[in-house]
């Protein structure tokens, strides 16, 4: 291969299926196939920065890609990034943007909430993944409480698994709410080490 092509290949993302990553994918598949019920199980994927959490989510999302037929979009796995501060309105904006929904200027929260719920159902979202969930701790206590209440509301209303992804701060945020702590099963991703698990 020419040098520039080799360089491009070296810079590209690479999936490394070390055992804990494969275990995380299997856990996501189990949740994805979970039958609809009143209280769905959720997952909290926790690990240090630059440890492959988002790559695991991207690999899973590609396994269940969005599609469209006629005038209908299908988005079985929706991945949304938590805004830099835990504002309910900003989260709904991010959620609607991830679904490609047009937003009118200065929408009111009740309208955004109803639109988001309607679209999540319409496009057939079966799992909602919230990346960078540790950003919940960036806000004040009132904003944090409102956002954690929103997570509970979405879980109850949609009856789909929620997956939080983030650093240890995400775990601390979820633990600050007794109900959410019972609903989110933490799965820790260890720090990368040069051992047999990571060698091919």
Positions of the model-derived regions?
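Walker A/P-loop nucleotide-binding motif
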Residues: 37-59
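A short helix-turn-beta junction within AAA+ P-loop NTPase domains corresponding to the substrate/partner-engaging
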Residues: 175-191
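Conserved small helical "lid"/interfacial subdomain of P-loop NTPases
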Residues: 190-200
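A short, basic N-terminal segment
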Residues: 1-41
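Post-Walker A helix-loop "phosphate-sensing" segment adjacent to the P-loop in P-loop NTPases
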Residues: 62-73, 101-102
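Mid-core helix/loop region of P-loop NTP-binding domains shared across ATPases and GTPases
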Residues: 1-2, 25, 87-91, 103-161
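Conserved NTP-binding/hydrolysis module of P-loop NTPases
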Residues: 77, 83-104
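A short beta-strand-to-loop transition that corresponds to the Sensor-1 phosphate-sensing loop
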Residues: 132, 164-170
């Amino acid at each position: 291969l020419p040098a520039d092509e080799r360089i491009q290949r070296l810079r590209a993302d690479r999936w490394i299926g070390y055992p804990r990553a494969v275990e995380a994918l299997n856990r996501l598949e189990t949740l994805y196939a979970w039958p609809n019920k009143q209280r769905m199980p959720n997952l909290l994927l926790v690990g240090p920065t630059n440890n492959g959490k988002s790559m695991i989510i991207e690999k899973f999302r590609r396994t269940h890609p969005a599609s469209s037929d006629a005038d209908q979009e299908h988005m079985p796995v929706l991945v949304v990034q938590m805004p830099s501060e835990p504002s309910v309105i900003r989260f709904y904006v991010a959620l609607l943007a991830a679904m490609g929904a047009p937003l009118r200027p200065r929408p009111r929260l009740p309208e955004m909430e109803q639109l988001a719920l309607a679209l999540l159902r319409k496009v057939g979202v079966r799992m909602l993944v919230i990346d960078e969930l540790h950003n919940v701790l960036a806000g004040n206590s009132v904003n944090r409480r409102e956002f954690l209440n929103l997570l509970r509301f979405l879980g109850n209303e949609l009856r789909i698994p929620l997956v939080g992804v983030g650093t240890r701060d995400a775990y601390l945020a979820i633990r600050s709410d007794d109900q959410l702590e019972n609903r989110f099963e933490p799965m820790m991703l260890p720090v990368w080490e040069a051992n047999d698990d990571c060698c091919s």
